[in-house]
Amino acid sequence: MNEHNIVITGFMGTGKSTVSRLVAEKLGRTLVDTDAEIEKRIGKPVARIFAEEGETYFRLVERRMCRFLAAQRGFVISTGGGMLVDDGNRDVMLASGTVVCLTADPEVLAERLRADQSDRPLMRGNWRGLLEQRRSAYESIPIQIDTSHKSPEQIADEIVALCQTASV
């Protein structure tokens, strides 16, 4: 597998998981969801890792996962929303392949997050403040796709076309 990775990131509610799955299916690549991988390796859900070990511990595990995956080739990687906020993680992933940051209008995010019943540790706080804190990190990623008024299928097709043009 000589192909570069395709890394899909963004704030919670932007569609990372759904879009990543579709991109992997369309390209016949293996999908790696970083949060799911961390859960598998640690043996507990992310929410429990946050509750029992704290965010600092989680970010350390996440950093290790980032470096491990960046050394692999040919994956579609769906990151946790905070993984590429870390400058080092972002640089490592940018060097490993094509990184796409999914965005959405705050009003659209609010609607999606209200409809999402999953247990997101950082949802318990002020998600708008968290989005604002992460904004500059997300904006530093060169490829941005606004998911506000597009279907997951449209977004996946856009990413596939982008990667085929770039020969990723």
Write out the residue ranges for each language-model feature.
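Post-Walker A helix-loop "phosphate-sensing" segment adjacent to the P-loop in P-loop NTPases
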Residues: 25-36
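P-loop (Walker A) phosphate-binding loop of NTP-binding proteins
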Residues: 11
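Hydrophobic anchor at the beta1->P-loop junction of P-loop NTPases
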Residues: 8
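A glycine- and Lys/Arg-enriched "phosphate-lid" helix/loop adjacent to the NTP-binding pocket
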Residues: 95-136
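ATP-dependent small-molecule kinase phosphotransfer cores
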Residues: 34-83, 87-94, 137
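NTP-dependent small-molecule kinase module
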Residues: 1-2, 22, 26, 72, ...
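ATP-binding Walker
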Residues: 14
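Walker A/P-loop
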Residues: 17
